[in-house]
Amino acid sequence: MKADIHPTYEAIEATCSCGNVIKTRSTLCKPIHLDVCSECHPFYTGKQKVLDTGGRIDRFKQRFGVFGATK
C-alpha cells in the first residue's frame, strides 16, 4: 500500500443554527455550520406541520383528470 495517500481524519465541531454543537470526525478538517440538527428538526422534536395542498391537487385533477379516465 502507498503511504500518505489518504486525507487526514480529524475531530471537528459541527454547529447548528439553533446553537447545538456536535462533535464528530471528518476529512474536511475545519468546523462546519448546519442548518438543522436532531435538536431542532421538526421530525425529531414532534412539532411537524401538515401542509394543506388540497387546493392545488384539486386544480390539477380538474385540468388533467379527463386524460386519466378509464374507457
Curated annotation (Swiss-Prot):
The lineage of its organism: Bacteria, Pseudomonadati, Pseudomonadota, Gammaproteobacteria, Pseudomonadales. Part of the 50S ribosomal subunit. GO terms for biological process: translation. SUPFAM superfamilies: L28p-like. Zn(2+) binds at residues 16, 18, 37, 40. InterPro entries: Ribosomal_bL28/bL31-like_sf, Ribosomal_bL31, Ribosomal_bL31_A, Ribosomal_bL31_sf. Binds 1 zinc ion per subunit. Belongs to the bacterial ribosomal protein bL31 family. Type A subfamily. One of its GO terms (molecular function) is metal ion binding. Binds the 23S rRNA. GO terms for cellular component: ribonucleoprotein complex; ribosome. Its cofactor is Zn(2+). This is Large ribosomal subunit protein bL31. Keywords: Metal-binding, Ribonucleoprotein, Ribosomal protein, RNA-binding, rRNA-binding, Zinc.
